[in-house]
C-alpha cells in the first residue's frame, strides 16, 4: 500500500500560487471593490482584512463552443426515439431559450451572485496604498526615514510555492540522486560486466549467472527507489528588503475644530487623517507627525487629543499656520527635513483672516515645504479662504487643494493628493 506524506512547510497554504495569480489578474476589479468598501467601515478596522466582491461576469473564462444556427450532423447515443435519417426539428428561438418555467417570482430578468472572497490585512493595505508616495521627497539625508525596497538575494530552503525555483530545485535533485546512487551504479556496472563475461564463457555457469542477475535486479530496484525529488532539494527565490537612500520627513496635520465644523464634518476630516497616518506608517519606517488643532487659537497636541478632544471655538485659520511656522523654525530645519502639511477645514474663516493666511503661506510656509495639501470639507459654496488658496495654487507647484462633499469622496481625494509621480528628486 502506498502512503503519501505531505512534508511541505506551507501545507495549509497549498493554493498560494493560484491566489497570487488571481489577485494579479483581477487587480483592477479588486481595487475598485476596496475603494467602495472603505467608505462603509472605519479605516482603523483592518485587522480582519476585507471581504471583496467581484461581479461574476468579470471573472468568466473564455470558452470554445459551436455558433448558433447553421446545419450540423450529430450523434445522439442511447436514444430510443429516433433512428438513422430521422430529422429533428430545430428548437424555436435562436437565442438559446432555455431555463424552464422555474422561479416564477419575477416576470423577467435574471442574474448571478457576485463572487466574494476574503483578502488579508497585508493584501488590503498593499492595494489600498499602491502607487502612492510623498510628493517631491528629497533624497539628501540618510538618518531617520528608512524606505525599503525588495531585492533578490539568492536562494533559500524555505519559502512559499509562488517563489519556488524549478531549475535550482531540479539541479539539487540531480546532484542528490547522483551522489546517493554513485556507489550502487559502479557496483551495477561491475556486476553487468561479470555477467557478460560469464555468459560468454564455456561451459555455461547457470547458478553463477542466476546469482548475478538477481543481484543486478536488486541493485536496480534500490536505485529506482531513490525519490526523484525531495523537500531537501527544493530551493526558493529569496528576497530581502534593503533600505533605500531617503531623507528625514515630517508631516504637519492641521485640523479645524471650530464651531462651524459639525460632527459629520469632523468625522470626515478624522477619516482623512487616519488614512494619511496609515499610509505613512505603512510606507515609511520613521516619519515625524505633528498634530495641530485650531479654532481661534492653535495648539500642538498628541495623537489621542488630536482625534478625540472635544474642544471647540471660533475660527481663525492663521493661528494654525503661525504655529506651524514656529515649530518649523524651532525643530525642523528645511535644509535637513522634507516638510509636508495637510490642512482640513470647512472653509469657514473670519473674513479679514483669509488674506493673512494667503500671506503666511506665500511668504513663510510654501517656500520651505515640499508639499502642502488643503482639503475643504463642505457642501456649501466656497468662501474667502478657498478663493485665497486658489491664487496660491496658480502660483506654487507644491500646493494642492481638493474638495470633499461626502464620505465617498475621501479615498479618491486622498489618492489624488498622494499619487506617485515621476521622479524629480534633487541631489
Curated annotation (Swiss-Prot):
It holds the Pfam family DUF444. Residues 92-102 have a biased composition (Gly residues). Residues 77-90 have a biased composition (Basic and acidic residues). Disulfide bonds: none annotated. Residues 72-109 are annotated as: Disordered. It comes from the Bacteria. Belongs to the UPF0229 family. Coiled coil: none annotated. This is UPF0229 protein KPK_3252.
